Amino acid sequence: MKRMSPARAIAYGLPGLATLFTFTMFTTYGLYFFTNVVGLSGSFAGLIMTIGTLWDAVTDPLVGILSDNRDPKKGRRRPFLLTCAVPFGIVTWLLFTTWDFVESRQKIYFIVVALLFYTFQTLIDVPYTSLSGEVTDDYDLRSKLATIRTFWAIIGVAIGGGIMTYTAFLEPVVGGIKQAWSVCFALFGFICTISILIGYKASEGYENQNISVKKSYSIKEMIEGPFRNKPFLHLTIAFIFAILAQAIFLGVLVYYLTYNLNLNDTQVSLVNIIMWIVALFWVFPIDHWSTKYSKVTSWIISMGIWLLCMIIFPLFFLKPGSTMAPIIMTSILVVGLNALYQVIYSMISDCVEVDELVSGERREGLFYSMATVSQKIAAAIGVSILGMVIDYVGYDPLASVQSISTLEGFQNIFVIGTSVCLLLSIITMSTNPLTKKRYSEVLQALQLKRTGQNISLDEFKDLLFLKKRSM
């Protein structure tokens, strides 16, 4: 495979700023925007993401299969980036823009825009992440490319972390808080479009044009491929629990900092900005753990640190009015938020090779689309639960001081909800059978298979659910 220079690899990772940044911003601030800025109920705000996710359950696999089956000579992945870059930027702006509609039309508007947002994110994210499997089959280089992609995403989130301060500053300038949010996300949308187009240009010449393409998949094949792949099942379940933890943690963080710890908008922005700036430095230890030990080990260490912070800091250090304790806590636990994408997306490409042992085809689009469906379903479930909890505990967005039961509700979902999900993620990933050594053995077997030699799948029973042979 063609070697990618460091400068090109850095440019290649830029679309991660668009897709991961917007998804994280929507997960972190979407609920707050809908409840406190637009004035919708927490339950309906959660419903918006749920509807978008149900739509994703259809579109993600379709886009994955569509990109897998395109003519390799014309490009299977890159054309999606060029076509969807501008619409994605526009929809990002519209998602955080409210108009003078009556409430019923306002609800319909946000449902439609959310569907468009999820659609264009899928049309970019699935082909783009699938492309990494064609760029290289090197275990460590895939980790480095995922590191660069995550690095750019964190830069975006670090900039976006100051949204509370930006909107407060812009409010008197543009004529209101709603207009301030719209202006901020118009700028974010423009940045996303530019980053996608740069990634499109940087990836030129790196699509594999010599891949055999199967024109269609049956529903049975769509299900069989991922579900017989043991490493993929382990990482997907671990991913789901970790995304649930992320959705709960980030979704309630603004409320927790504002009401439980009595921080103002500037202090809340400061905590978020510093957290994501420090996150830039965590990408290097994560990459080191992945290449020196294994991606599974890197995941367990990162999520373990996050889990410990969720237990220790609320018990002993977080006090109302203190800014330093939450800054220290989030600066440490953000290693887990980094690993969530940095580790998992490099592992999916490894699972594609395991599938190729049986199918004889490279189906990155199918596997990445199944992973993104899992990601969005988990996020929607997390935000929906959070929205219902916010309503259940009696949250009043017009009150500067919340009731004791509301504060206890925020505390419980923040600490217990996040911690339980993290623990389940660690347990699931720790039993993943695809070690660095086993991956090397998979590559060796594939090299033999590609030259026409027979291989025994029985040697890979720990990685695949194999059909029993009839006597």
Each model region followed by its residue ranges:
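Membrane-embedded alpha-helical bundles of multi-pass transporters/translocases
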Residues: M1-M471
